[in-house]
């Protein structure tokens, strides 16, 4: 469904073809293995990994070539999505990072993630602070806010967030 512009409200056919390649090591802080699904250096039941994709999207017969970056979120087994999950993923030419916060009523805040400056070793985050505002009325401007991250090495990473685009999912 088109959410803005002259075709707003119309339903258009969409096709997507992507070739996906890992561009960094997998990240995991949890332990775990599943039969026929294990590795020596990281938990295979849950991990994230920076990726780059190339391909094309066809919307209503119009083809657009794509080169995009993102984060592979691999979960094997149940994941309790009824908790307050917040993710911040950045993946560019200089670095990749993932910051996660999980809020469970009555429990201390769970925060984790990684920062990987390309050409350097991946660093675990010891603290994540995500201060976000959500705009439910406009999916194209759905979130704004700030973040403050602390790596185990002492490196600090701070920034602000401003939506430049968005869509309903």
Segments the model singles out, each with a brief description of its role:
Residues 1-169:
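Structured soluble/peripheral alpha/beta segments that form catalytic or ligand/cofactor-binding pockets
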């Amino acid at each position: 469904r088109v959410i803005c512009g002259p075709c707003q409200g119309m339903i258009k056919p969409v096709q997507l073809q992507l070739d996906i390649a890992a561009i960094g090591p997998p990240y995991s802080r949890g332990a775990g293995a599943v039969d026929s699904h294990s590795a020596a250096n990281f938990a295979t039941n849950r991990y994230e990994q920076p990726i780059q994709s190339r391909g094309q999207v066809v919307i209503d017969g119009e083809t657009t070539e794509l080169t995009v970056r993102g984060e592979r979120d691999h979960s094997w087994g149940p994941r309790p999505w009824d908790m307050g999950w917040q993710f911040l993923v950045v993946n560019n030419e200089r670095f990749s990072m993932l910051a996660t916060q999980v809020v469970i009523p009555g429990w201390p805040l769970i925060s984790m993630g990684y920062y990987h400056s390309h050409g350097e070793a991946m660093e675990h985050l010891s603290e994540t602070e995500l201060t976000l505002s959500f705009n439910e009325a406009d999916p194209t401007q759905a979130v704004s806010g700030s973040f403050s991250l602390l790596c185990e090495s002492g490196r600090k990473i701070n920034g602000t967030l401003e939506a430049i685009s968005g869509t309903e999912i």
